[in-house]
Amino acid sequence: MEGFGSDFSVGGSSAGKVDTGAIMEQVKVQIAVANAQELLQRMTDKCFRKCIGKPGGSLDNSEQKCIAMCMDRYMDAWNTVSRAYNSRLQRERAKM
């Protein structure tokens, strides 16, 4: 009689083996989605607080312009920081 959980043993059939590559890809996708959601949430919070003085049923023209400009600046800043961070990571990895 085989032991409990023998489908995941090192030897034997590949039917029960875990595909770690596929799992890693799924985790990477989930992390990317979570990061994008967090970026969007932070940007929305900051721009709302900056641009909306008195919340109402709709945005006036100046509020719309303020939000658009705020979001553009936020994304530009995030992209600049992201590029600098990735560049630094690459330099650090090259030193290893």
Swiss-Prot record:
Keyword annotations: Chaperone, Disulfide bond, Membrane, Metal-binding, Mitochondrion, Mitochondrion inner membrane, Protein transport, Translocation, Transport, Zinc
Family affiliation: Belongs to the small Tim family.
Record-given protein name: Mitochondrial import inner membrane translocase subunit Tim13-A
Pfam families recorded: zf-Tim10_DDP
Subcellular location(s) of the protein: Mitochondrion inner membrane
Keyword Mitochondrion included in the entry's annotation: yes
GO cellular component: mitochondrial inner membrane
InterPro entries listed in its UniProt record: Tim10-like (IPR004217), Tim10-like_dom_sf (IPR035427)
Description of its domains: The twin CX3C motif contains 4 conserved Cys residues that form 2 disulfide bonds in the mitochondrial intermembrane space. However, during the transit of timm13-A from cytoplasm into mitochondrion, the Cys residues probably coordinate zinc, thereby preventing folding and allowing its transfer across mitochondrial outer membrane.
Species this protein is from: Xenopus laevis (African clawed frog)
Gene name of the encoded protein: timm13-a
Molecular function in Gene Ontology: metal ion binding
